[in-house]
Each structure stands twice: as C-alpha cells, then as structure tokens.
Amino acid sequence: MQLTLWTYEGPPHVGAMRIAASMKGVHYVLHAPQGDTYADLLFTMIERRDQRPPVTYTTFQARDLGGDTAELVKRHVREAVDRFQPDALLVGESCTAELIQDQPGALAAGMGLTMPIVNLELPAYSKKENWGAAETFYQLVRTLLKDQAPAELNHDPKAWQHEGRRPRVNLLGPSLLGFRCRDDVLEIQRLLNMHGIDVGVVAPLGATVADVHRLPEADLNVCLYPEIAESSCAWLERSFGIPFTTTVPIGIGATHDFLVEVHNLLGMTPPSPQEGIRQSRLPWYSESVDSTYLTGKRVFIFGDGTHALAAARICKEELGFEVVGLGTYSREMARPVRAAAKAMGIEALISDDYLAVEAAMAAAAPELVLGTQMERHSAKRLGLPCAVISTPMHVQDVPARNSPQMGWEGANVIFDSWVHPLMMGLEEHLIGMFRHDFEFVDGHQSHLGHSGGSGAIADTEVAVSTLTDELVWTAEGEAELKKIPFFVRGKVRRNTEAFAKSTGRNQIDSETLYDAKAHFSA
C-alpha cells in the first residue's frame, strides 16, 4: 500500500460502479463503511449526470463491527430490491469491507431473490479500477448468457448474406467515466452505418439486461475499449463463436485498418484507402506547408493503454512527431505498450506514481505532452504545452458538445487538440521575443484607444537567478535565455548549466550560453 496525493485509478469497486451506472435496470449493493460513499461525486461532478449512480451502501460504522454485520448486508439488499426493483443485482464490497470477510455476494445469493445476482469478488489490494470494470462486465455477461451458450459452435459472421439483412455488430466497452465514450459511440455508429452495417447493442453504456441477452444475435463484436471489454469479447468468442475486432479506430490509419478488419470479418469488400482523406482534415494538413513547422516535435505520451498506443501511432505516422516518451498506468496493457515503445527505440514507462512520470517527462525534454489530468499539472509546472488524451480527467475534459476521439471526426478533434497548443505556444514565444520593441511596450497606444496598454501581456516565467551554491545566472544570461522558445528553454537551461559546471564557470552569462550552444551543436 502506498500513501499518495494522487492516483490514476480508484479501487476496483469504483470500476464496478461505473458498469452499474452505465447500464439501465442494474443495481449495485456495496458493503462499505461511511467514508467510501465519495464515489457518487465522480458521476455527478465529473460526468455532470443528473442522477446518482444506482448504488446502495451498507455504510457500516465502527460500532457495527461488534454486532452482526452480515445481517446488515442482508437488510440493505432486501431494501434495495424492494425500492429499486432491478432486473439484475450486483453485490460486492469495498476495499475496507474486504477486511471483514462478510462475503456479501454469498449472503445475497442465499436470500431467494428472483432476479440474477452477480457476486463480485474484486481484490482491492492487488487490482484497480479498470480491472474492476472489466471483471464486473465479464461476470455480468457470463451470468446472464451462460444458459444460452450452444452445445456446438456454428456461428457464421457472414450469415447475413443469405438471411437477406444488413450485417449487425455490437459495440462493447464504452462506459461512464471513460474518455469521450459517449461521443465515440455516436461517431462509430455513424461510420458503420455509412458502410451499411447496423449496430445491434451498445454495452455497457446505455444497455439493459434485455440488451445483454441479445448480444449473441450479432455477427461480430467490436471491442472499442480493450481495458473494459476484451475479456467479455473473448468469452463470447469461446462460448458462442462470435469473433471480435482488435483494432481501436483512433486516428486516420487505425480507422482505416478498423474498417478493413470489420469488412473482412463480415465478408464485405474493404473500403478505399482514400476515404480518410475525403472525410478528415488531418491528412490534408499533414501534407501542407504549414505542417513542416510541426515535423520532428518531441512528444511525451502517458495515459491508459488504449489511448497511449493510439497517440503514439498518430504522432509517429500521421503528424511526423518524434515520440520521446511512452507509458501507461494500466498494468493490464503493459505488454503492448512495451512492444510499441521498443519499436520506437525507447523504453516504456509502466507506473502509477505521478512523481515518477513527471521526472521522466522532465528528463525527456519534450515540446508537447499528451497525458491525463495529472500530466497537465506536471506539464504546467515544467512550462510545457499539454493536451489531455486519457482518463483520469477533469470536468473540462467532458465537454457538452460532441467531441469524439474515434473515427474520421475523432481525427479532426485530435488534430485540433494536439496542434493548437504547439501553435499557440509559438505565438506566445513571438510575443515574448518582441516584447521590448516599441510596438509591444506597455503604454504604447493603439487604434483602439488612448489609455495605453493594459499590461495583460506579461512574462509568465519566473527567472531563477541562483540555481545552486556554485552557479549563478546573470541578468544578461537570463535575458538571452528568454529569447529561446519556451518549449526547448528547459533543455537549453540544463545543457548550459552542465556545460558551465564542466568548464568551471561560476556565472552564466550570454557568452556562456553561446559557448554551450556551440559545444552541444558540434
């Protein structure tokens, strides 16, 4: 166990809560102390939902531990069933309640209830939120469908051709508190419909128990988020013979590969490679003169496995960036992330320690950071532009507008989100670079009025004149350093300090800066 100020994932019962809150007619009875009810805020504040998650807490207190806590569990289960009348009941325990060993799932199973009961055994001290969500969805699907499994697997994904209907697929994996899941579903539904493919069931987001029962009716399962749905897709393939996709359609190349995979599995003619060029603005920009400014920009990527891998591919193949850091906090996705990093000639960072991530970020000296909410804070401290690509996220990353990451429109959104920080960074640098010119000096009158400048444009970087006991930046040296673009300024500062130490200089002035530049450029 680790004491920390920040965690990328909550305990596994939060993942179970995400599945319950994503679905309709499903209720979750959580054996937990009073302090574990904080999770409600995640849905009402972050997701901005107008309803609380369908969760009943036993909320035992210290004085209850001397009595019969098992009876407390049964009473809350009974009350939840009578009040909410769910179609399926999830029963589990929080990390604190796990220590009591009351086994609430077994208690609920012995109460003679009529609806399906899913006993969730989520090891809170070895697993985390995404695993908990995946395990909950898997156990729910398995509980509801195990009696429908055929004796022999004879599923044919091309059966739609002789049945006189359009092909049908399920979209599996989107959930509440996922990154842009709602918008991704709309975009992928639109994309598949353009190609004559119907979407049968979307689960768990918005699905009912009846929808889960209809999962075997599809020709193909689309695994949109492997962290959540891969185990369920694999079980459906083993039990019903339904194949599933392995390509996540984030980016131009991945979206095309996804469409080719879907069409091949369904026995359809693959689409033209030119479709992405017609549908998205990203390929056009990548071929334009303007994009040459972005070529070779150093990028540090960190997030959940799905979005980190997608970001690395987009950066390398579609935007011409240089990936100098790649990592994930999802240990379940460590293997593919390590493989992708190795292919790019770097070492993957698999960690859930935000301080280790920040240290790696500083060492990589990137010009753009793609990460989670925490990387946004870290990048701000380091003076780097950042775009959020993954959960965990803040409310500002749950826009009311449609803003997908997947499909052709998702490529447009990604293009805006990633390129604008770099472009605006250049603008800020130019303003800072020419701030001493008479046209930029505070007090210079403009055509808008005669009251002078407002002082809105200020130098945001605090100069550190004394870095160590031995090294001192002179005012002249600091002034020269500020003429260097902000996104490489940190690297130049570190290189100059290292050069000054190696040459025995105590003060760093403009001459030292130029000497260091010549040394490292040689």
Curated annotation (Swiss-Prot):
This is Light-independent protochlorophyllide reductase subunit B. Signal peptide: none annotated. GO terms for molecular function: 4 iron, 4 sulfur cluster binding; ATP binding; metal ion binding; oxidoreductase activity, acting on iron-sulfur proteins as donors; oxidoreductase activity, acting on the CH-CH group of donors, iron-sulfur protein as acceptor. It catalyses: chlorophyllide a + oxidized 2[4Fe-4S]-[ferredoxin] + 2 ADP + 2 phosphate = protochlorophyllide a + reduced 2[4Fe-4S]-[ferredoxin] + 2 ATP + 2 H2O. The keyword Cell inner membrane does not apply. Keywords: 4Fe-4S, ATP-binding, Chlorophyll biosynthesis, Iron, Iron-sulfur, Metal-binding, Nucleotide-binding, Oxidoreductase, Photosynthesis. Protochlorophyllide reductase is composed of three subunits; ChlL, ChlN and ChlB. Forms a heterotetramer of two ChlB and two ChlN subunits. Binds 1 [4Fe-4S] cluster per heterodimer. The cluster is bound at the heterodimer interface by residues from both subunits. Its EC number is 1.3.7.7. It comes from Synechococcus sp. (strain CC9311). The active site is at D290 (proton donor). Component of the dark-operative protochlorophyllide reductase (DPOR) that uses Mg-ATP and reduced ferredoxin to reduce ring D of protochlorophyllide (Pchlide) to form chlorophyllide a (Chlide). This reaction is light-independent. The NB-protein (ChlN-ChlB) is the catalytic component of the complex. PANTHER family: LIGHT-INDEPENDENT PROTOCHLOROPHYLLIDE REDUCTASE SUBUNIT B. GO terms for biological process: light-independent chlorophyll biosynthetic process; photosynthesis, dark reaction. Its cofactor is [4Fe-4S] cluster. Pfam families: Oxidored_nitro, PCP_red. The keyword ATP-binding applies.
